[in-house]
């Protein structure tokens, strides 16, 4: 398993966790073009992202998530509360696949087990 910071700070946060079968983007706080550039700099193609996991609704964690998900048909994993708050901040696309999680219980995204 590999873990890579795509960027961290007040301008944006994004991390990638990968194994041989799954590429999980944790948060996506940079705009679409910047996210694609940062992923490419790490040798990661945006279209290969399996899922996006949003930890919370702050702008520096969600800025590019919905655009990236919409462009590459990537599912977004998030809590109902995060979804509700995001929908107040940005236009939510109903074409995106949303997977609602319980922020207090472990869950699986393909081959990666996530424990909150």
Give residue ranges: language-model regions.
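Metallo-beta-lactamase
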Residues: 80-116
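A generic structural signal for short beta-strands and their flanking turns/coil linkers
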Residues: 13, 22, 48-50, 72, ...
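Conserved beta-strand hairpin/beta-sheet module of binuclear metal-dependent hydrolase folds
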Residues: 1-42
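Generic preference for hydrophobic
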Residues: 3, 52, 76, 98, ...
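Active-site metal-binding motif and surrounding structural segment of the metallo-beta-lactamase
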Residues: 33-81
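Structured catalytic core of nucleotide-sugar glycosyltransferases
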Residues: 4-15, 56-58, 87, 114
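A generic "binding-loop/recognition-motif" signal
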Residues: 11, 31, 58, 82, ...
